[in-house]
Every structure is written in structure tokens, then in C-alpha cells.
Amino acid sequence: MSGNTIGKLFCVTSFGESHGPAIGCIVDGCPPGLVLSAMDIQLELDRRKPGTSRHVTQRHEGDRVEILSGVFDNITTGTPIALLIRNEDQRSKDYSKIMDVFRPGHADYTYWQKYGIRDYRGGGRSSARETAVRVAAGAIAKKWLHERYGIVIRGYMAQLGPIAIPFKNWEVINQNPFFVADDDYVPKLEAFMDALRKSGDSAGARINVIAEGVPVGWGEPVYDRLDADIAYAMMSINAAKGVEIGAGFNSVTQKGTEHSDEITPEGFLSNNAGGILGGISSSQPITVSVAIKPTSSIRLGRRSIDKAGNPVIVETHGRHDPCVGIRATPIVEAMLAIVLMDHALRHRGQNEDVVCTTPKVPGNIINPTNPVTTQPDVRRAEDPEPDENS
């Protein structure tokens, strides 16, 4: 199997299956000198790990990360960083009834047709379990980006099934099990999920993520555009079925006078472009929205076929997320961080010495209530100033 690596200079290669002994990744290209401990990574993993509420899978994995190489005395050495997370709570017998059938909407059928063999236990390589190591790698990228450039990457759930959740403030996002930015909606979401779980069905979600503080100039046209690489990374996430950047599909109904973001010496007047123009970052906040499909493994009977091609009814019993989108926010943040760090290193390698006499337009801070409007650029007191010499 190929296609297990993302990135050109900051490269992440993942390995492992849902019910194997462990999952892990190799992070290659991280510069030396970054202060990094297992706790830096664990903090992000704990946001994603299963079994944290009744609304997600009850598979209880500690997701304790082990740093096997690339770090000495809590400082990155510039050599490959090997990260390992051991699987501790597999229950493979739950999948014995589907070993010879294909779950509708799942990768079972296509993996079987492509490889002629598949690990049916928990979906094997196609399981969302693999995303834990993306979060681990993304934790490294998030820390490096923040320390070198002051970049802040934050996400939140904007919709769960039919329920759209407005943005209220960032502070409550990590204080509720849904990563929503308005905790007044939590009781409504809990009632929706309780009813969904009892029905045996599943639901989708929409995750928004914003990167603030990205300098102007990152991105490699034409085939390695920053927005193209972001979309590629997001669509590699299990269950992702759509990506929008900036105004996204709303651009279809806009006129040019509405969509094009006017520029003033004080900043941009809107952010329909989502912080990217011509595949290159504009210094505006990068805004991304990802659609997560409903979980394929559900208890309700669905028509399918077995390995012999015979019609069957498939019911999936086991510990599954009724909505994988509930735990997707840290994953989406991680993938954006990985792409941005890769492009930061690529830009530094070729264009660090470029001098442009035109003054740089301030990158206004996004207004999360409306992702295409902006606010004055006010850096948070705790954020470091960008280090142009790093």
C-alpha cells in the first residue's frame, strides 16, 4: 500500500491498524531545537481520544504516546521523530459477523477489490483509529508554528446533523464534549445524540478551523497551491466528504463585487478568499470548513453483498461513534498544522531572502461568527511576536 505519507519537507508517514498491536508515525523534517516532550503531544491526543463521553465510542484507549527517536533531552535533534501509540482495548470478536460481508458506505468493499485481502477487525487501516497519529504529528507542527510565527490554529463544530451551532466564543470549546463554541447548545446536542444512539443510526457534522497569524507568501503554485494542499489533507481524513475554503460554495451565488476582498492600507475589508489568493497565503486568517459523513457502522439492517456476491442484510454491532465528527475537531486542526508547517519550510528554503518594497497589508483577525468578515488585527498578549529569523 502506497499513499501513507503527506508533505514534502515536513513529512508524516503513518502506520498501523485499528486492532493491531499499535499505531504510529514517523515525522521527518522537523527542524532541530524545538523543545518537545511527550506531554506536548499528549495534550492534543487527550482532546481526541475515545471513551470521553457517552456520545462517542466506548472503546477505552489511553492513547499514551511514546517518543522513540528524534528527541534528546526534550529537544528535537532534526532526525526522524518516531511516535508510537499502543492499542489497548481491541475487541475483535465484535466484528466476526462482518468478516465475509461488506458494510454499506464503508471501505470494506473497495479494500477487498483492490487488495484481495482486508483486516475486517474495526476496519483495519481504513479505521478512524489511524487519525490519532495525525493528531500526534500535528501537535509538533502546531507548537513549531506558534513558537516561530505566533500562528494560532483553532477549530470548532459548526453543525451536528441538522443542528447548526452559532459561534459564541473560543473559551468554551474545550469545555464541552462536542467542541462547540456556544455551550448553550450542549443540552440540545446531547438530546439529539441520545435519541440517535437509541435509534441505532448515525449522523454527520461540519467542522470549521481557522489559522491566524500565517504570513503572506506561503504556497507553491500551481500544483502545490496552499489551498489545494489543505483540501488534499482534509479529504484524506476518514469520513471527510467535502471541503470549503473561505466563502466556498457560497461563491457561486456571489457577484464579483461581493466576492473579491477589497484591500486598504489598514487591511482587507472581507475574507471570502479564506486567507489564500492564487494558492498563496495573503496574511488573512485561513478559514476551512470540512463536512464529515455519518458513520457507516450502524445497528440498523442495510442491504449489501457477501464475498460470493450474494445479497445480505448487514447489521454492525460493536463500539462505534454515532457521529465521528464529534471527535474530528483536533484532527482537522492537526491536518491544517501539518500542511502549514510543510509550506513554511518550503517557503523558507526558496523565498526567505525575497525583498518586496510594497508594504505588507495587515492580516485582520477573523470574526468567527461570520468567517468572511474581519476584525482589527489585535494580537493576543500571550502570543509571541513572529520570529522572522527562525
From Swiss-Prot:
GO terms for biological process: amino acid biosynthetic process; aromatic amino acid family biosynthetic process; chorismate biosynthetic process. Belongs to the chorismate synthase family. One of its GO terms (cellular component) is cytosol. Reduced FMN (FMNH(2)). This reaction introduces a second double bond into the aromatic ring system. NADP(+) binds at R48, R54. Pathway: Metabolic intermediate biosynthesis; chorismate biosynthesis; chorismate from D-erythrose 4-phosphate and phosphoenolpyruvate: step 7/7. It holds the Pfam family Chorismate_synt. FMN binds at R125, S126, S127, N238, A239, G278, K293, P294, T295, S296, S297, R319. NCBIfam families: aroC, PRK05382.1. It comes from Nitrosomonas eutropha (strain DSM 101675 / C91 / Nm57). CDD domains: Chorismate_synthase (cd07304). Residues 360-390 are annotated as: Disordered. Keywords: Amino-acid biosynthesis, Aromatic amino acid biosynthesis, FAD, Flavoprotein, FMN, Lyase, NADP. Residues 366-376 have a biased composition (Polar residues). InterPro entries: Chorismate_synth (IPR000453), Chorismate_synth_AroC_sf (IPR035904), Chorismate_synthase_CS (IPR020541). PROSITE patterns: CHORISMATE_SYNTHASE_1 (PS00787), CHORISMATE_SYNTHASE_2 (PS00788), CHORISMATE_SYNTHASE_3 (PS00789). GO terms for molecular function: chorismate synthase activity; FMN binding. Its EC number is 4.2.3.5. HAMAP family: Chorismate_synth (MF_00300). This is Chorismate synthase. PANTHER family: CHORISMATE SYNTHASE (PTHR21085:SF0).
